[in-house]
Amino acid sequence: MFRLRVVLAAAALHGLVGCVTDPTLGVVDWKHGARRGNVVSTYTADLPVTQLPKCLADLPRDQYTTNRYVKVRYRNVRLTRSAVAQVPPTLDIKDGDVIELWPADCEAGSIARITRVLSVKGQ
């Protein structure tokens, strides 16, 4: 009887673990520097240069207005960091989406890369 209870408890626990596992874990290329990030906001084309981060303010204005840029938050060890990334024209990215990010230092003038959408907000 005791053994049956242990087996049933283990089966229930195993079933619950599947409910809380994030499906995007394990699909990011961590080994080569990619991170799992959340899109926080989109930089609009009409935003004044004084309100842009350094890497976007340094771009020629026509390059800034013809491309889409987003602010992304990602975790690096225990710290939450922010990055500015250009949205590839082939991807439809919205605020709240989870993406694969290749971080870069915006203060040094570098813009991060987004390679794919891992999950869409609301799904």
PLM region spans:
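Intrinsically disordered, glycine/charged-rich N-terminal periplasmic/extracytoplasmic linker segments
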Residues: 41, 55-123
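Bacterial lipoprotein signal-peptidase II cleavage site
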Residues: 20-27
